[in-house]
């Protein structure tokens, strides 16, 4: 199999809010849209945001959503500060293996900033 492009499909309940979050807050470039889904560039892959998911007012626990959307950045603290200015609550944590900045999207899906490998 020769992979042409990879993608992630994110089923959402708060569809419009999630589009705004990923497009405007995280600056993922717009690719295309239909009434039921929106596709944004996700580095060399794509993030397809679709209707039909279930939201949570708090961060979903792992058995509700065992996936984390990871955004590798040059500097976690700087990226976290940029998101905070836009109103995104980011918790920066340091581990022996690196630094992350954890936050959630409008549906309660966990996302993380990560320093380079």
PLM region spans:
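Short beta-strand micro-motifs in enzyme catalytic cores
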Residues: 38, 67, 99-101
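N-terminal beta-strand motif that seeds the catalytic metal site of vicinal oxygen chelate
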Residues: 1-19, 67-69
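Conserved short beta-strand elements that form part of the metal-binding/catalytic scaffold
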Residues: 29-64, 110-116
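Vicinal oxygen chelate
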Residues: 1, 81-117
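Short secondary-structure junctions
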Residues: 27-33, 88-92
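Alpha-helical scaffold elements within enzyme catalytic domains, especially in hydrolases
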Residues: 21, 39-41, 82
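Amphipathic alpha-helical segments
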Residues: 14-28, 85
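Mid-chain, well-packed structural core segment of small domains
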Residues: 67-80, 87
């Amino acid at each position: 199999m020769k992979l042409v492009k990879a993608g992630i499909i994110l089923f959402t309940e708060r569809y419009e809010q999630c589009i705004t979050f990923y497009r405007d807050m995280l600056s993922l470039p717009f690719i295309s849209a239909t009434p039921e889904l929106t596709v944004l560039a996700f580095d060399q892959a794509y993030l397809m945001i679709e209707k039909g998911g279930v939201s949570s007012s708090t961060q979903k626990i792992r058995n509700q959503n065992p996936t984390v959307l990871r955004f590798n950045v040059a500097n976690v603290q700087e990226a976290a500060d940029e998101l905070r200015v836009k109103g995104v609550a980011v918790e920066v944590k340091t581990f022996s293996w690196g630094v992350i900045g954890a936050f959630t999207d409008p549906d309660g899906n966990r996302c993380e900033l990560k320093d380079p490998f």
